[in-house]
Amino acid sequence: MAKQKKPVKPFLTDVKTLRDRARKHIAGGGVTFTYKGDVKKAIDILQAVLATEIVCVLRYTMHAVAAQGISSEGVKAEFAQHAKEEQGHMNEVAERINQLGGVPDFNPTTLTSRAASEYGTAGNLVEMIKENLIAERIAVDHYRELIRYFGDKDPGTRTMLEGILVVEEEHANDMHDLLVAHQGHPML
């Protein structure tokens, strides 16, 4: 006689349960029942990321305007392009804060105290490139840590940060290449 198997419980939630949960917790917006992270902590972390991106936009913009010299035109264009891309990151992060139920903090008086990177100064061209390279390296390390932190608890935020990280790594490489071009040797 064949042994009867117990019915296998599916790992997916049935559609009726999903619908009922969505209706019951409608006030949660994009933060659903299955969100495993600490929403308040996620928002606080993202506020610091937002501040970092704003400071980067401001620094790159200032450098794009302030860069001078016979060989500055290409560098100015690179700074301006990076400022535009950082502004895109800023908008992504602000939108994610909003999705999690927070209000993005654009308060200019607290930006530098909340940001991982520094604003910098308008020195000579090589100094500007170095400041941006340092800021990008800080962002890369910081975002890698945050990606590990969010992991499976908040895949939406993790995925957003992974996309931003790829661009920040490209920015760091661009700044390194500019530094090599203007100093004549790699900084290894």
Please place each PLM-identified region on the residue numbering.
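Iron-associated oxidoreductase/ferritin-like identity signal
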Residues: 1-188
